[in-house]
Amino acid sequence: MADSYTELEKAVVVLVENFYKYVSKHSLVKNKISKSSFRKMLQKELNHMLTDTGNRKAADKLIQNLDANHDGRISFDEYWTLIGGITSPIANLIRQQEQQSSS
């Protein structure tokens, strides 16, 4: 990874690398994560952000709806949709905290 990457570029690289870390090397379906591995990834990698019951429920609902083609696996595009769905409420929370601290 280039040292000259911006913070945002580094964050994107981490998200991409994290997806491929959980793709099974023994999977017959390349570049997809099984739902069970995906849940493990969420528990391990997003544990602190998903400790809030609302966030966890939202993630569970997204997982149910994520598998657009119903193949039982999560593609990179489906993963990216989940990341967006999880970060949206977090962004709202951060914005609220900033507004409260500036009041």
From Swiss-Prot:
Keyword Metal-binding included in the entry's annotation: yes
The record's listing under SMART domains reads:
S_100
Query: Which cellular components does GO assign to this protein?
Result: cytosol; extracellular space; nucleolus; nucleus; perinuclear region of cytoplasm; plasma membrane
GO annotation terms (biological process): response to calcium ion
- InterPro entries recorded for this chain? EF-hand-dom_pair (IPR011992), EF_Hand_1_Ca_BS (IPR018247), EF_hand_dom (IPR002048), S100/CaBP7/8-like_CS (IPR001751), S100_Ca-bd_sub (IPR013787)
- Keywords carried by this UniProt record: Calcium, Cytoplasm, Metal-binding, Nucleus, Repeat, Zinc
Gene3D superfamilies noted in UniProt: EF-hand
List residues of the EF-hand domain.
12-47, 54-89
- Does Cytoplasm count among this protein's keywords? yes
Query: What GO molecular function annotation could you give as one example from this UniProt entry?
Result: calcium ion binding
Q: Where in the cell is it found?
A: Nucleus, Nucleolus; Cytoplasm
Domain notes, please? S100A16 proteins, but not other S100 proteins, have only one functional Ca(2+) binding site per monomer. Upon Ca(2+) binding, undergoes conformational changes leading to the exposure of hydrophobic patches which could be implicated in the Ca(2+)-dependent nuclear export. Binds Zn(2+). Ca(2+) and Zn(2+) do not bind to the same site. Does not bind Cu(2+).
| Function text | Calcium-binding protein. Binds one calcium ion per monomer. Can promote differentiation of adipocytes (in vitro). Overexpression in preadipocytes increases their proliferation, enhances adipogenesis and reduces insulin-stimulated glucose uptake.
Q: Its quaternary structure?
A: Homodimer. Interacts with TP53.
Q: What is this protein called?
A: Protein S100-A16
Q: What species is this protein from?
A: Bos taurus
